[in-house]
Amino acid sequence: MQTLPSSETVLLGSNSAPPVLRSPGGDDVDIDFGDVFGGPPKRRSKVTSNEVTRHSFSESALRRRDVIVDVGDLLPQDEKPVFGEDTSSVRRRFTTDDFFDDIFRVNESSSLPGSRILSPAHKPESSSGTSSPSQFSLPAKATEIPTFNLAATRSLNKNKETVSSSPLSRTSSKADVVSTAKSYSDDCDDPPQVFVTGKGRQFHFSIYKWPNKGVPVVIWGSSRLSSMSKAEETTPVPLSDYRKTSVVEKLGKNEEGDGKSGLSGLKDVKKTSLKRPGVQTKEEKTETDLKSEQAFFGVSKAREANVKPLDSVESEQAFSGVSKAHEATTVKPLHSIFHEEDERQDEKIVSEREVRKGKSKAKNTRSFTEDSRTKKKSQGTKSSLDSSPIPDKSSFASSSAAPEVGKDGVKGKVSDFVKIFSKGASVGAGGESLGQSSRWRAKETPKTDIIHDGSNAKETVNIPDQQKKSTPDIPAMNRDQKPSQSTQKKDSDRESMNYKAPGDTVQEERQEPSTTHTTSEDIDEPFHVNFDVEDITQDENKMEEANKDAEEIKNIDAKIRKWSSGKSGNIRSLLSTLQYILWSGSGWKPVPLMDMIEGNAVRKSYQRALLILHPDKLQQKGASANQKYMAEKVFELLQEAWDHFNTLGPV
């Protein structure tokens, strides 16, 4: 046994035994690590105290010296067999030189990588079979673990018993772990160098990557700063943030008095930013924008306050361009929307007018428009649109503003609309234009004779009647304040009807009386159809019977009043004279007044009268309605008298 000072590091060769660190009291180890995979640990009988030697992070373990101990000292002598083994004859051992070869050099995946990750050396065949616990009780400073001499020869013969022979133990999770490792490729024969430090939180290791493909084990030296810098390199920076940072850096350089120009300074910023893979493509795309900004800063050398107007100018230009494009595109759809709404409203109004107006009125309007148009053609006068003021200014406000828009071809439609609706109001006698005062002028000149130059004879036109029809039409349409296509179509149809031959008008005049005659017949038809012929004799008989019943009821009421007069409330007198009021065959036997002196006799007579006058009894006997009515009235009188008799008490 050899003891080394704590300042020295322990360097073990590939053929030496694995390093085992324990306290000087080696016989007092209280855990049998040879039985890690066989069940719960077994305590030795020689354990005296639960020292802290089993934990590698205790302060005492860090202070005491590192000791190289023989593996055989830790082997239990009275170990029980695990899974039926005999520990005396069968020993667990490192069988071949390439025991750890499958972890560090072989391409195929290792069987249990977790149990062989920190295997320290190739253990040659020895008498001590079981592996010792690897308690890495290392000092706080880094200690170099022996380099592994890996043989070039490989063997596929693996002992299945060595699966549980890993130097890892239950306490290895608390030990110091590998922090950095030198990567090597498959072609290189140099073994990897593994270093151990006391910072377990920096451990990053994967045996599936670096033994085969030569990928270096990424283990950062300084925990948070290095990780933040690494993550910052991989994360892409937005383009707007990059512009802001580059502008601020350039302004700082200009203020400090750097001799560099704006162009060169921003090129340096771009070079440094090209290291980031996420930003590279975005910066290449916006190279022209950066050059424009560079030229601006190179000329003005302004500060951060002067940079902001550039962004605002760009935003204003962009906004103005968008607003212009919006104006150019939205003029037509907005106007079309108004047209659609007006078309709907005008269709409703026109349909109502057509229903209200008769065919004779439509005939008069057609004749008047035809006469006015022929008069215009003969005299060659100007249109009413050019010479006359608009009848209602508020109605045609939109139409006057519409020609300014004129790009969409609305000007012609509006002018046609105004022409159509201003004919009746603006054209007066002799083709003169009339304004809003045309109504009053029409009153002053009630009638005018219009002489045609054609073959037609003179025709007298009643202008007040026509203007009464035409002038109300214009304000009705003024409410809409928008031209419509439906009204134009209908007016064009009217104009086409005006140009028909005179023979056609005569035929229409002949047809009108026939239509009026047919409508009158249609009105008369339902009058005859809706009536049914019924026999009224039965109803007359019923009425006669009802009248007879009413007379009989009156007679009964008079008879009852006469009988009850002076006897109301006197039960004895009513019962003694009951045979005078009841009909014959009622079943009432007269009772003399002398027999009803006592109270019991009165009670018996009253009960007999109730049996005769009760409605159920009358129903059984088949009494008539008049008899039932009489019995009801008599019963009411007897009931009142009986109540009065009970209040008086016995006599």
Curated annotation (Swiss-Prot):
CDD domains: DnaJ. The modification Phosphoserine is found at residue 56. Expressed in leaves and stems, but not in roots. The keyword Cytoplasm applies. Required for chloroplast photorelocation movement; chloroplast accumulation upon low blue light and for chloroplast movement to the bottom of cells in darkness, by modulating chloroplast actin (Cp-actin) filaments distribution, appearance and disappearance. May mediate a slight resistance to aluminum in root hair cells. This is J domain-containing protein required for chloroplast accumulation response 1. InterPro entries: DnaJ_domain, J_dom_sf. Disruption phenotype: Lacks the chloroplast accumulation response under weak blue light and chloroplast movement in darkness, but shows a normal avoidance response under strong blue light. Non biased distribution of chloroplast actin (Cp-actin) filaments. One of its GO terms (biological process) is actin filament organization. GO terms for cellular component: cytoplasm; mitochondrion. It is found in: Cytoplasm. Residues 532-562 form a coiled coil. Residues 126-137 have a biased composition (Low complexity). Residues 586-651 form the J domain. SUPFAM superfamilies: Chaperone J-domain. Residues 1-17 have a biased composition (Polar residues). Residues 250-259, 281-291, 337-357, 405-416, 441-456, 488-497 have a biased composition (Basic and acidic residues). Residues 1-56, 114-138, 156-176, 250-291, 308-526 are annotated as: Disordered. The J domain co-chaperone activity is required for chloroplast photorelocation movement. The keyword Phosphoprotein applies. Keywords: Coiled coil, Cytoplasm, Phosphoprotein. It comes from Arabidopsis thaliana (Mouse-ear cress). The gene is JAC1.
